[in-house]
Protein backbone atom coordinates (compact mmCIF):
# COMPACT_ATOMS: atom_id res chain seq x y z
CA UNK A 1 0.00 0.00 0.00
CA UNK A 2 1.36 3.38 -1.01
CA UNK A 3 2.02 6.03 1.61
CA UNK A 4 0.06 9.28 1.12
CA UNK A 5 3.10 11.55 1.28
CA UNK A 6 1.06 14.69 0.60
CA UNK A 7 -1.04 14.09 3.73
CA UNK A 8 1.98 13.91 6.04
CA UNK A 9 3.14 16.84 8.13
CA UNK A 10 5.55 19.30 6.49
CA UNK A 11 8.98 20.12 7.87
CA UNK A 12 7.97 23.78 8.10
CA UNK A 13 4.41 24.13 9.41
CA UNK A 14 3.23 27.21 7.51
CA UNK A 15 0.02 27.45 5.49
CA UNK A 16 0.13 28.41 1.80
CA UNK A 17 -2.37 30.71 0.13
CA UNK A 18 -2.33 29.21 -3.36
CA UNK A 19 -0.99 25.88 -4.58
CA UNK A 20 -1.92 24.39 -7.92
CA UNK A 21 -1.21 24.21 -11.61
CA UNK A 22 -0.66 26.81 -14.33
CA UNK A 23 -0.33 26.76 -18.11
CA UNK A 24 -2.73 23.85 -18.58
CA UNK A 25 -4.29 23.96 -22.07
CA UNK A 26 -7.50 22.14 -22.94
CA UNK A 27 -9.77 22.08 -25.98
CA UNK A 28 -13.36 22.91 -25.08
CA UNK A 29 -16.58 23.25 -27.04
CA UNK A 30 -19.19 25.69 -25.77
CA UNK A 31 -22.67 24.93 -27.09
CA UNK A 32 -25.00 27.88 -27.72
CA UNK A 33 -28.75 27.82 -28.28
CA UNK A 34 -29.61 28.31 -31.98
CA UNK A 35 -26.01 29.29 -32.75
CA UNK A 36 -22.85 27.58 -33.89
CA UNK A 37 -20.74 26.21 -31.01
CA UNK A 38 -17.61 28.07 -29.93
CA UNK A 39 -14.36 26.11 -30.03
CA UNK A 40 -11.69 27.38 -27.63
CA UNK A 41 -8.19 26.30 -26.63
CA UNK A 42 -7.96 28.10 -23.28
CA UNK A 43 -5.24 28.06 -20.66
CA UNK A 44 -6.24 27.15 -17.12
CA UNK A 45 -4.73 28.18 -13.80
CA UNK A 46 -6.20 26.31 -10.83
CA UNK A 47 -5.34 26.81 -7.15
CA UNK A 48 -6.41 25.77 -3.67
CA UNK A 49 -5.04 26.80 -0.29
CA UNK A 50 -3.04 24.38 1.85
CA UNK A 51 -3.18 24.12 5.66
CA UNK A 52 -0.01 24.21 7.71
CA UNK A 53 -0.56 20.62 8.84
CA UNK A 54 -0.30 19.11 5.35
CA UNK A 55 2.85 18.64 3.27
CA UNK A 56 1.26 19.07 -0.17
CA UNK A 57 -1.91 19.11 -2.22
CA UNK A 58 -2.85 16.10 -4.30
CA UNK A 59 -1.66 17.78 -7.49
CA UNK A 60 -3.09 15.28 -9.98
CA UNK A 61 -6.61 15.96 -8.72
CA UNK A 62 -6.69 19.48 -10.18
CA UNK A 63 -6.22 18.55 -13.87
CA UNK A 64 -8.48 15.56 -13.19
CA UNK A 65 -11.23 17.99 -12.15
CA UNK A 66 -10.90 19.96 -15.38
CA UNK A 67 -11.07 16.78 -17.48
CA UNK A 68 -14.25 15.67 -15.70
CA UNK A 69 -15.95 19.04 -16.10
CA UNK A 70 -15.04 19.31 -19.79
CA UNK A 71 -16.43 15.83 -20.41
CA UNK A 72 -19.69 16.78 -18.70
CA UNK A 73 -20.07 19.82 -20.99
CA UNK A 74 -21.09 17.51 -23.84
CA UNK A 75 -24.43 16.91 -22.12
CA UNK A 76 -25.20 20.62 -21.60
CA UNK A 77 -27.26 22.53 -24.17
CA UNK A 78 -26.08 26.01 -23.15
CA UNK A 79 -22.87 26.57 -21.20
CA UNK A 80 -20.89 29.75 -20.53
CA UNK A 81 -17.25 30.03 -19.57
CA UNK A 82 -18.20 31.56 -16.22
CA UNK A 83 -20.32 28.51 -15.40
CA UNK A 84 -17.42 26.29 -16.41
CA UNK A 85 -15.23 28.10 -13.87
CA UNK A 86 -17.90 27.73 -11.16
CA UNK A 87 -18.23 23.99 -11.76
CA UNK A 88 -14.46 23.60 -11.53
CA UNK A 89 -14.46 25.44 -8.19
CA UNK A 90 -17.15 23.13 -6.78
CA UNK A 91 -15.30 20.06 -7.96
CA UNK A 92 -12.01 21.32 -6.52
CA UNK A 93 -13.58 21.47 -3.07
CA UNK A 94 -14.80 17.89 -3.51
CA UNK A 95 -11.37 16.62 -4.50
CA UNK A 96 -9.36 18.76 -2.07
CA UNK A 97 -11.41 18.31 1.10
CA UNK A 98 -8.78 20.14 3.18
CA UNK A 99 -9.09 23.35 1.12
CA UNK A 100 -11.05 26.39 2.31
CA UNK A 101 -10.29 28.54 -0.76
CA UNK A 102 -10.19 27.70 -4.46
CA UNK A 103 -9.47 29.81 -7.51
CA UNK A 104 -9.77 29.27 -11.27
CA UNK A 105 -8.54 31.50 -14.07
CA UNK A 106 -9.27 30.63 -17.68
CA UNK A 107 -8.15 32.64 -20.69
CA UNK A 108 -7.89 32.01 -24.40
CA UNK A 109 -8.23 33.42 -27.89
CA UNK A 110 -11.69 34.00 -29.31
CA UNK A 111 -12.05 34.20 -33.08
CA UNK A 112 -14.60 36.52 -34.71
CA UNK A 113 -15.38 37.67 -38.24
CA UNK A 114 -14.70 41.32 -39.09
CA UNK A 115 -15.05 43.59 -42.12
CA UNK A 116 -12.71 46.35 -43.25
CA UNK A 117 -14.47 49.72 -42.82
CA UNK A 118 -14.72 50.82 -46.47
CA UNK A 119 -14.11 47.87 -48.82
CA UNK A 120 -15.92 45.44 -46.49
CA UNK A 121 -13.27 42.75 -46.94
CA UNK A 122 -13.77 39.88 -44.52
CA UNK A 123 -11.03 38.66 -42.20
CA UNK A 124 -10.65 37.03 -38.82
CA UNK A 125 -10.29 39.02 -35.62
CA UNK A 126 -8.76 37.55 -32.47
CA UNK A 127 -9.65 38.75 -28.99
CA UNK A 128 -8.64 37.37 -25.63
CA UNK A 129 -11.52 36.29 -23.41
CA UNK A 130 -11.22 35.46 -19.72
CA UNK A 131 -13.16 33.92 -16.88
CA UNK A 132 -12.26 33.96 -13.20
CA UNK A 133 -13.90 32.34 -10.20
CA UNK A 134 -13.02 32.41 -6.51
CA UNK A 135 -14.63 30.21 -3.89
CA UNK A 136 -14.49 30.11 -0.09
CA UNK A 137 -15.73 27.36 2.24
CA UNK A 138 -16.67 27.95 5.86
CA UNK A 139 -16.66 25.57 8.83
CA UNK A 140 -20.14 24.30 7.94
CA UNK A 141 -19.01 23.43 4.39
CA UNK A 142 -21.04 26.29 2.91
CA UNK A 143 -19.42 27.46 -0.32
CA UNK A 144 -19.58 31.02 -1.63
CA UNK A 145 -18.41 31.57 -5.21
CA UNK A 146 -17.79 34.82 -7.08
CA UNK A 147 -17.32 34.70 -10.83
CA UNK A 148 -16.18 37.23 -13.43
CA UNK A 149 -15.94 37.32 -17.21
CA UNK A 150 -14.05 39.69 -19.42
CA UNK A 151 -12.07 40.40 -22.54
CA UNK A 152 -8.88 42.02 -23.76
CA UNK A 153 -8.98 43.86 -27.08
CA UNK A 154 -6.33 45.66 -29.13
CA UNK A 155 -7.05 49.05 -30.70
CA UNK A 156 -5.30 52.26 -31.77
CA UNK A 157 -4.91 55.51 -29.85
CA UNK A 158 -3.70 58.92 -31.02
CA UNK A 159 -1.96 61.22 -28.55
CA UNK A 160 -3.84 64.53 -27.96
CA UNK A 161 -0.79 66.30 -26.50
CA UNK A 162 1.54 65.85 -29.48
CA UNK A 163 -1.34 66.66 -31.82
CA UNK A 164 -1.98 69.96 -30.06
CA UNK A 165 1.73 70.85 -30.23
CA UNK A 166 1.76 70.27 -34.00
CA UNK A 167 -1.49 72.20 -34.39
CA UNK A 168 0.01 75.24 -32.63
CA UNK A 169 3.11 74.93 -34.80
CA UNK A 170 0.97 74.80 -37.96
CA UNK A 171 -1.00 77.89 -36.88
CA UNK A 172 2.23 79.81 -36.34
CA UNK A 173 3.61 78.86 -39.77
CA UNK A 174 0.35 79.70 -41.54
CA UNK A 175 0.27 83.11 -39.86
CA UNK A 176 3.85 83.75 -40.96
CA UNK A 177 2.76 83.05 -44.54
CA UNK A 178 -0.03 85.63 -44.28
CA UNK A 179 -3.12 83.47 -43.85
CA UNK A 180 -6.01 85.06 -41.97
CA UNK A 181 -7.47 83.55 -38.80
CA UNK A 182 -10.56 82.47 -40.74
CA UNK A 183 -8.46 80.81 -43.45
CA UNK A 184 -6.36 79.04 -40.82
CA UNK A 185 -9.49 77.73 -39.11
CA UNK A 186 -10.88 76.45 -42.41
CA UNK A 187 -7.58 74.76 -43.26
CA UNK A 188 -7.26 73.04 -39.90
CA UNK A 189 -10.90 71.93 -40.00
CA UNK A 190 -10.24 70.31 -43.39
CA UNK A 191 -7.15 68.25 -42.58
CA UNK A 192 -6.02 65.77 -39.93
CA UNK A 193 -3.22 66.94 -37.65
CA UNK A 194 -0.41 64.45 -37.17
CA UNK A 195 0.47 62.90 -33.83
CA UNK A 196 2.15 59.77 -32.54
CA UNK A 197 0.10 56.61 -32.09
CA UNK A 198 -0.02 53.73 -29.68
CA UNK A 199 -1.31 50.22 -29.89
CA UNK A 200 -3.85 50.24 -27.09
CA UNK A 201 -4.83 47.17 -25.07
CA UNK A 202 -8.13 47.50 -23.24
CA UNK A 203 -9.32 45.05 -20.60
CA UNK A 204 -12.67 44.77 -18.82
CA UNK A 205 -13.65 42.20 -16.17
CA UNK A 206 -17.20 42.19 -14.79
CA UNK A 207 -18.64 40.10 -11.98
CA UNK A 208 -21.57 37.88 -12.97
CA UNK A 209 -24.00 37.74 -10.01
CA UNK A 210 -26.22 34.67 -9.63
CA UNK A 211 -29.25 34.94 -11.88
CA UNK A 212 -27.65 37.46 -14.26
CA UNK A 213 -25.87 37.24 -17.60
CA UNK A 214 -22.98 39.33 -18.91
CA UNK A 215 -22.38 39.07 -22.65
CA UNK A 216 -18.71 38.90 -23.60
CA UNK A 217 -19.54 40.28 -27.06
CA UNK A 218 -20.87 43.42 -25.37
CA UNK A 219 -17.65 43.78 -23.38
CA UNK A 220 -15.58 43.40 -26.56
CA UNK A 221 -17.62 46.07 -28.34
CA UNK A 222 -17.25 48.50 -25.41
CA UNK A 223 -13.47 48.15 -25.44
CA UNK A 224 -13.32 48.69 -29.22
CA UNK A 225 -15.42 51.86 -29.05
CA UNK A 226 -13.42 53.35 -26.16
CA UNK A 227 -10.15 53.94 -28.03
CA UNK A 228 -9.32 56.33 -30.85
CA UNK A 229 -10.08 53.64 -33.40
CA UNK A 230 -10.25 49.95 -34.19
CA UNK A 231 -7.52 47.85 -35.78
CA UNK A 232 -8.06 45.32 -38.58
CA UNK A 233 -6.16 42.35 -39.94
CA UNK A 234 -6.94 43.16 -43.59
CA UNK A 235 -6.94 46.74 -44.92
CA UNK A 236 -6.79 47.96 -48.51
CA UNK A 237 -5.44 51.46 -49.20
CA UNK A 238 -8.76 53.25 -48.86
CA UNK A 239 -9.42 51.37 -45.60
CA UNK A 240 -5.99 52.25 -44.22
CA UNK A 241 -6.46 55.93 -44.96
CA UNK A 242 -9.87 55.88 -43.29
CA UNK A 243 -8.63 54.11 -40.13
CA UNK A 244 -5.70 56.50 -39.66
CA UNK A 245 -7.77 59.62 -40.35
CA UNK A 246 -10.59 58.60 -38.03
CA UNK A 247 -8.16 57.79 -35.21
CA UNK A 248 -6.57 61.23 -35.53
CA UNK A 249 -10.01 62.83 -35.37
CA UNK A 250 -10.55 61.08 -32.04
CA UNK A 251 -7.34 61.53 -29.99
CA UNK A 252 -7.35 59.96 -26.53
CA UNK A 253 -5.01 59.67 -23.57
CA UNK A 254 -4.76 56.33 -21.80
CA UNK A 255 -6.91 57.90 -19.05
CA UNK A 256 -9.57 58.87 -21.59
CA UNK A 257 -9.84 55.28 -22.80
CA UNK A 258 -10.27 53.91 -19.28
CA UNK A 259 -12.92 56.51 -18.41
CA UNK A 260 -14.80 55.91 -21.65
CA UNK A 261 -14.89 52.18 -20.92
CA UNK A 262 -16.30 52.93 -17.47
CA UNK A 263 -19.00 55.19 -18.91
CA UNK A 264 -20.03 52.59 -21.45
CA UNK A 265 -20.00 49.73 -18.92
CA UNK A 266 -22.32 51.69 -16.60
CA UNK A 267 -24.68 52.40 -19.50
CA UNK A 268 -24.67 48.93 -21.05
CA UNK A 269 -24.96 46.91 -17.85
CA UNK A 270 -27.54 49.06 -16.05
CA UNK A 271 -29.45 45.93 -15.00
CA UNK A 272 -26.67 44.59 -12.77
CA UNK A 273 -26.76 45.21 -8.98
CA UNK A 274 -24.79 48.04 -7.36
CA UNK A 275 -22.39 45.66 -5.61
CA UNK A 276 -21.24 44.11 -8.91
CA UNK A 277 -17.44 44.29 -9.12
CA UNK A 278 -15.81 45.83 -12.19
CA UNK A 279 -12.19 46.06 -13.33
CA UNK A 280 -11.21 48.36 -16.20
CA UNK A 281 -7.64 48.60 -17.48
CA UNK A 282 -5.97 50.34 -20.42
CA UNK A 283 -2.34 49.89 -21.49
CA UNK A 284 -0.93 51.90 -24.38
CA UNK A 285 2.26 50.69 -26.05
CA UNK A 286 4.10 53.95 -26.66
CA UNK A 287 5.71 54.68 -30.03
CA UNK A 288 8.08 57.53 -29.06
CA UNK A 289 8.89 56.36 -25.53
CA UNK A 290 10.47 53.19 -24.18
CA UNK A 291 7.81 52.89 -21.50
CA UNK A 292 4.09 52.14 -21.72
CA UNK A 293 1.15 54.19 -20.41
CA UNK A 294 -1.26 52.61 -17.90
CA UNK A 295 -4.65 53.44 -16.37
CA UNK A 296 -6.94 51.29 -14.22
CA UNK A 297 -10.06 51.41 -12.07
CA UNK A 298 -11.29 48.67 -9.76
CA UNK A 299 -14.69 49.42 -8.25
CA UNK A 300 -18.34 48.44 -7.99
CA UNK A 301 -21.07 49.50 -10.38
CA UNK A 302 -22.76 51.40 -7.55
CA UNK A 303 -19.69 53.55 -6.90
CA UNK A 304 -19.26 54.24 -10.61
CA UNK A 305 -22.94 55.14 -11.02
CA UNK A 306 -22.70 57.65 -8.19
CA UNK A 307 -19.62 59.29 -9.70
CA UNK A 308 -21.24 59.60 -13.12
CA UNK A 309 -24.46 61.23 -11.87
Curated annotation (Swiss-Prot):
Subunit structure: Homodimer.
EC number: 3.5.4.39
Protein name, per record: GTP cyclohydrolase MptA
Residue(s) at site: May be catalytically important: 159
Key words of the record: Hydrolase, Iron, Metal-binding
PANTHER family in the record: GTP CYCLOHYDROLASE MPTA
Gene3D superfamilies for this protein: Urate Oxidase
Family membership: Belongs to the GTP cyclohydrolase IV family.
Catalysis performed (reactions): GTP + H2O = 7,8-dihydroneopterin 2',3'-cyclic phosphate + formate + diphosphate + H(+)
Cofactor note: Binds 1 Fe(2+) ion per subunit.
Record's function text: Converts GTP to 7,8-dihydro-D-neopterin 2',3'-cyclic phosphate, the first intermediate in the biosynthesis of coenzyme methanopterin.
Originating organism: Methanococcus aeolicus (strain ATCC BAA-1280 / DSM 17508 / OCM 812 / Nankai-3)
MF annotations from Gene Ontology: GTP cyclohydrolase I activity; GTP cyclohydrolase IV activity; iron ion binding
Source taxon at top rank: Archaea
Named cofactor requirement(s): Fe(2+)
